[in-house]
Amino acid sequence: MFSLSSLSSSGGHSEQKERERISYFDIRINSPYKDIILIQGSPLELSSIPLSGNLVISVKNEIVVKKISLRLVGRFKLEFLQVGRYKKNSSSLASLVKEKRKIFECYWDNLLVSSKGDVLVGGENAENQHNSSSGRSTSNQDMDTSGNAIFLSKRSLSSPVFNKIIRRKTHSSHRKILELPENGVTGTPFEGLRENARSRSSSSNTLNNNSHSYSNRDGSGSSYLFLMKRGNYELPFNTMLPPEVCETIEGLQSGSILYSFEAIIDGRQLWDTDLSVHTSPHGPIGSTSTSGNGMRTKNKIIIKKFKYLRILRTLSMDNLAMQEEISVGNTWRDKLQYETSIPSRAVPIGSTTPVKIKIFPFEKNIRLDRIEMALIQYYAMKDSSAQIYDDEIAVMKITHLADFGPLTDKLDVDCPFTIPDNLKQITQDCCLQDNLIRVMHKLQVRILLQRQVDGEYKNLEIKAQLPMLLFISPHLPMKGRLVLFDKHDGKIHFRPGELVPLFLTTYPAQGLTPGVELNSTTTAHLALPQPPPNYHESTNDHLMPALQPLGADSVVLTVPSYEQAQAQASASSYVTGSVPAYCDDD
């Protein structure tokens, strides 16, 4: 007996079939940094952001596929334990806050037909498209009064009638087959093929965002199958991300925004009697069609690949925060005056910023004990009901001990502070999608002094808070969390205690089966953007000696005096060999 769940299964030996047919399967992003999209500037400074790449497949044995789809999903997650206290008895009450929703989705229905992706969630017109397509799909189903939807609603899903319908539709779904070229292909092999059928299929199923394959009402989706022969395939994909797309947030313990790709090869197993095909001379290049009623399929072969994508944002070069110096100072009457400063409010993650402290004592017997600095990270998150949860933690603390003796004059102290270089320990400053997640930082400085009064030392404490804007810079070494995927449902897991370097420019050559050459799948190594050289290191602008006059390579000219100029003018009037003037005889 058939059941409803058996229709969506991927076959009894899907993993074995996957190893037999596909030797390499990967998603590659066109970016100078591996699996990272780096956006420079704020959403107000940018237009749409291009995203492109290639789906790389190395086919070991021939495989028949219905389509090769790709999906990019961004998910917002809240999960933490909120603890509240009563004032009367100081008892605590804990409640679990948990929420997970999709904030971005882009879908490529079939990369064999089109490389352009459709933004379904998170785009400018995604919500309107979703509502309109949902209305169309609902109306089409209601109008089909003689179809299977209304008929099956009156029957039990486990009834023999239902199983008979399933068996008949499974065995009678005939399609034509298109054969791809030998040794693989680079590009979209059947660009624009049945584009109308593809658009109807994707629009009528926009409601079901959790399904892994879109299809028409008859369950076929398209009337074509594709035969992929042994070889290497590069299928391009591209789309435009909205400028306000949220950044990846992976370091906060209570909330996150994570992006992941999911590529699916929707394979089919053919009946033995339908394995022979013949070439169609009038079809597209490399296409074949079957005789009779076409190809018949019986089982699905689903092959999945997941890829973690980081979308990070950095500051533009003309951001005012880079040139803004932060200084905090105050005066204690009859005691001292102090000033604490950092050269720039914008500090890249993984760098070291100098903290300058100046103390002007107004009386004797004051000495500096130590300087304590702490980097405070404030973060706030908002759930679907607009409830805001905020907290702050000390990301890093350092202490500088000092023994300068009694302060008798101005004291200048330079205390370098190093920002952590991994995105698990610290999160960049951000304000995402109507305060969905907001992160800010400040540097807290405590100056501990001792003042001698009547032979005893009393403690003096100076507190200063310097606002900082922490941003991501690709020019500094940085680390992120190691991501692992559940091979069945694509759930993201972070391996505790392990980090991976970011902003790598090369792809590892792992996963390639020996004997299978990938001729066109090598990703170009793009050079990192370098800052301009210092002036004394310039090679195009040649420096001139300070005492060398302008035009040093030209002949030195001397200016004659007035008498010399008059003598030269009178001598030139008696030059011999000159042509006489014309005179008229009349």
Swiss-Prot record:
UniProt GO molecular function: protein-macromolecule adaptor activity; ubiquitin protein ligase binding
Keywords, alphabetical: Endocytosis, Isopeptide bond, Ubl conjugation
Compositionally biased intervals (Polar residues): 126-145
Region (Disordered): 123-145, 182-217
One GO CC term, this protein: plasma membrane
InterPro entries: Arrestin-like_C, Arrestin_C-like, Arrestin_domain-protein
SMART domains given in the database record: Arrestin_C
Cross-link entry Glycyl lysine isopeptide (Lys-Gly) (interchain with G-Cter in ubiquitin), positions: K364
Post-translational modification: Ubiquitinated by RSP5.
Protein's GO biological process: ubiquitin-dependent endocytosis
Segments of skewed composition (Low complexity): 199-216
Source taxon at top rank: Eukaryota
Misc remark: Present with 1970 molecules/cell in log phase SD medium.
Family (UniProt): Belongs to the arrestin family.
Oligomeric and partner information: Interacts with RSP5.
Function: May regulate endocytosis by recruiting RSP5 ubiquitin ligase activity to specific plasma membrane proteins in response to extracellular stimuli.
Protein name: Arrestin-related trafficking adapter 5
Organism: Saccharomyces cerevisiae (strain ATCC 204508 / S288c) (Baker's yeast)
Classification lineage: Eukaryota, Fungi, Dikarya, Ascomycota, Saccharomycotina
